[in-house]
Amino acid sequence: MKQTFTRIIFVAMVTLATSTLFAQRAALSGEWKLDEKKSELGEFARAATSVKAEQKEDAITITRVTPGFNGGDPMTNTVTLTFDGKVVESEGFRGSKRKSTAKWSDDGKTLVVSSTMSFERDGQTSEFKSTETWSITKDGQLSVVTQSNSPRGESTVKAVYTK
């Protein structure tokens, strides 16, 4: 009897420990459209007008459509990021290379995407760094808060998307 009770306690403790270790992750999958009224874009910010996220256990594929420059055609960019911290290289602005990583918060409620892009212009190299924090709001919307640092300074943009 005492041995059975000990086993039950052990199983309960292991179950509790593993459930907190593998916290339920926010469900980011879906086709999302920018809600400009709820977003805080700033004067020169360029947020994606639509985002498609395909989330799996070990990776997420993100497709963004952003407005073209000076009324040009919209630009589409797709990247697949793994959750193991591996650096993924993709094409950035005007042929530059973007290096990105993705990592879940300990509670699984936010996904943090960190990126670095290097530009060459007039023989000089500039670096642009950004950190995106993805989460689902209480009312089921996608929130992407982007903090960026470039030669022009620092900025924070909050984009809110609806399905």
Regions of interest found by a model, annotated:
Residues 1, 22-23:
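Intrinsically disordered, low-complexity regions enriched for glutamine and histidine
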Residues 9-20:
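Bacterial N-terminal signal peptides
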Residues 23-163:
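Hydrophobic small-molecule pocket/channel-lining residues, especially in calycin-type beta-barrels
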Residues 1-10:
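Bacterial N-terminal signal peptides that target proteins for export
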